[in-house]
Amino acid sequence: MIRPLFATALAALVLVPLCARAEDEPPVPATITFVVSSGFWEELPDAEDDAEEATAPQAARRGYYKLVAERQPDGTALVHLQQIEATPDGPKIASSTVLEEFSALKPYVTDIRPENSAGITIQPGLFATVYLKTDPAVAEPESWTVLIDDLGDIKVERATN
């Protein structure tokens, strides 16, 4: 009698944490349809800051860009641009913004692709193509480019092929 009761209690102790984990939020929300990490950015410390803190020189901040398409309840998407900083503790979001140029179109995003998939870029910045439809019934998507130059200026425009 005690042995089956003990086995049941032990099974409950093992299964309760598993059930709790199943109810936790997923690591990537279901509304995220596309994510592309590409390009890179770097911020050098200001010379004025170095003069004030001569005993502790600051390292340059570095990282990469991420474009994220997030599906909205009406089926259209928001396109987020994030700067991800590479830190000793791992990546962290340095900045995040919704690209209003896409929001104004109320797009149905069908794909996002980086300039190259090698993972290596020579110049700082980002070049990626967002494929979208403004009417879901249209067969072919439009191509839009997101360009960030070496100074950090962002340009979103329809691709010209």
Language model: regions and residue ranges:
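Bacterial N-terminal signal peptides
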Residues: 7-17
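Positively charged n-region of N-terminal signal peptides that target proteins for export
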Residues: 1-4
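Exposed acidic/polar residues on beta-strands and adjacent loops within beta-sheet cores, strongest
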Residues: 21-161
